[in-house]
């Protein structure tokens, strides 16, 4: 649009005096029109004067300086592949080096597995790339440095010196338990306790295993606990004592269980949902309190949640609470359980729904919503209404039966109304006296 307007405003004088107009400052669009009018007679004038041609020339010149040709050669110095990279970028890691000299420093320092030959030509730069064959020779063959030479180290395991000489054996602090159990008491003869289960000879496998653990020799007999009835009897202990491993494990397990039992008795545990104190039997049982559901606490939380609703009246909150508690107790989870739950809910709360009409209408609206969502069908709604109608009919018949009097009760009332004959005579005498007084 600007070019057309300027072209329309231009006059023949401007076409003639283009050289003079170039010397005067003018707008770029007008200057471009002057160039265009002048290029009609000289077509080569416009490409030489436009700025984009000048910029293209600069760009071409910069490309020529930044263009690098990589010639990849094999071991026999045979050309295998040629690649052209611009902006002096590395062909291996694509790093911009900025200049050919920077590219030379980068290739020699970062890619030392290749051998590079750099050549500068008038039009472009060339880099001949070949593989260093010496880089694949292992360092073990030509390593003159002593730091890289392998060496061997041989060390003997150190023996731990014992206090008091080499031949001293380790001593164990053995505690003998009192012979309270009947099985141990039966094995005592002449005040010497012969523990057949615990202390065995070295011929048994358990004894030999323990002897190997405690560095026992065949010359040292096992320790035997002597218990005598005399008060002056002494307990003789040898250098080693054989204690069965199974017995010690059982004793340690029993002690740990007793200790944990005492710790559980000292602490007070509470239920996770009800926050009520737990008895020791409940703590030691396998049942987890996390899985339990307290109905009272759940009802209380449900009522608190419903009380926060503002746009719901009291009757609707009562119905919602009844339905929520029923669904929770009966574990109604899937959509297929809704039909059964509606019928059972109608039977369970038929008296409440019959006595309170507001709850009854809330129940009907709830059934309609379930039907809209496709959770119940018309047969389920019919069954629920039939249950409530039967409840209403039974209540009406009971009321009618209570209002009708029994025949025996009416006869008793009539008998009570009949007067005695003496009472009738007294009434007649009173009437006659009244009449005589009136005549006088």
UniProtKB/Swiss-Prot annotation:
- Places the protein is found: Nucleus
Q: Report where it is expressed, by tissue.
A: Weakly expressed. Expressed both during, and in the absence of vernalization.
Stored InterPro entries = Polycomb_protein_VEFS-Box
Q: Which Pfam families match?
A: VEFS-Box, Zn_SUZ12
Q: Which parts of the sequence are annotated with region: Disordered?
A: 398-440
Ranges of Basic and acidic residues compositional bias? 420-440
List the GO terms this entry assigns under cellular component, sorted alphabetically.
Answer: chromatin silencing complex; nucleus
Motif extent (Nuclear localization signal): 156-163
Q: What does this protein do?
A: Polycomb group (PcG) protein. Plays a central role in vernalization by maintaining repressed the homeotic gene FLC, a floral repressor, after a cold treatment. PcG proteins act by forming multiprotein complexes, which are required to maintain the transcriptionally repressive state of homeotic genes throughout development. PcG proteins are not required to initiate repression, but to maintain it during later stages of development. They probably act via the methylation of histones, rendering chromatin heritably changed in its expressibility. Associates constitutively along the whole FLC locus.
For this entry, the protein name equals Polycomb group protein VERNALIZATION 2
Q: Which organism is it from?
A: Arabidopsis thaliana (Mouse-ear cress)
């Amino acid at each position: 649009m600007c070019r057309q307007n300027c072209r329309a405003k231009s006059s023949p004088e401007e076409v003639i005096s283009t050289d003079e107009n170039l010397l005067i400052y003018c707008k770029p669009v007008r200057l471009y029109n002057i160039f265009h009018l002048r290029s009609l007679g000289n077509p080569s004038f416009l490409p030489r004067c436009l700025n984009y041609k000048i910029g293209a020339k600069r760009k071409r010149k910069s490309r020529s300086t930044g263009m690098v040709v990589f010639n990849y050669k094999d071991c026999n110095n045979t050309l295998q592949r040629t690649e052209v990279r611009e902006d002096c970028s590395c062909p291996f890691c694509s790093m911009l080096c900025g200049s050919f000299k920077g590219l030379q420093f980068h290739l020699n320092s970062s890619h030392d597995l290749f051998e590079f030959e750099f050549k500068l030509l008038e039009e472009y730069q060339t880099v001949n790339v070949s593989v260093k064959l010496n880089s694949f020779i292992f360092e073990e063959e030509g390593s003159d440095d002593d730091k890289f030479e392998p060496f061997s180290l041989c060390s003997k395991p150190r023996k731990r010196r014992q206090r008091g000489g080499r031949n001293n054996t380790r001593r164990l602090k053995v505690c003998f338990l009192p012979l309270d159990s009947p099985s141990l008491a039966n094995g005592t003869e002449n005040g010497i306790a012969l523990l057949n289960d615990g202390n065995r000879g070295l011929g048994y496998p358990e004894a030999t295993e323990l002897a190997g653990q405690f560095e026992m020799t065949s010359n040292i007999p096992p320790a035997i606990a002597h218990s005598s009835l005399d008060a002056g009897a002494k307990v003789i202990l040898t250098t080693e004592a054989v204690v069965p491993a199974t017995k010690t494990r059982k004793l340690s397990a029993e002690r740990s269980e007793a200790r944990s039992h005492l710790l559980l008795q000292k602490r007070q545990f509470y239920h996770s949902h009800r926050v009520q104190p737990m008895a020791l039997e409940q703590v030691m049982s396998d049942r987890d309190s996390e899985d339990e559901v307290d109905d009272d606490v759940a009802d209380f939380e449900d009522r608190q949640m419903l009380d926060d609703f503002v746009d719901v009246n009291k009757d609707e909150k009562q119905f919602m609470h009844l339905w929520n508690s029923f669904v929770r107790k009966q574990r109604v989870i899937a959509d297929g359980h809704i039909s059964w739950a509606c019928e059972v809910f109608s039977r369970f709360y038929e008296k409440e729904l019959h006595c309170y009409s507001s709850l009854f209408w809330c129940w009907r609206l709830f059934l309609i919503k379930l039907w809209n969502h496709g959770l119940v069908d018309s047969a389920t709604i019919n069954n629920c209404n039939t249950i409530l109608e039967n409840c209403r009919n039974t209540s009406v018949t009971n009321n009618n039966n209570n209002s009708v009097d029994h025949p025996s009760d009416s006869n008793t009332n009539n008998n009570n109304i009949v007067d005695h004959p003496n009472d009738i005579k007294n009434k007649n005498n009173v009437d006659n006296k009244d009449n005589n007084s009136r005549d006088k």
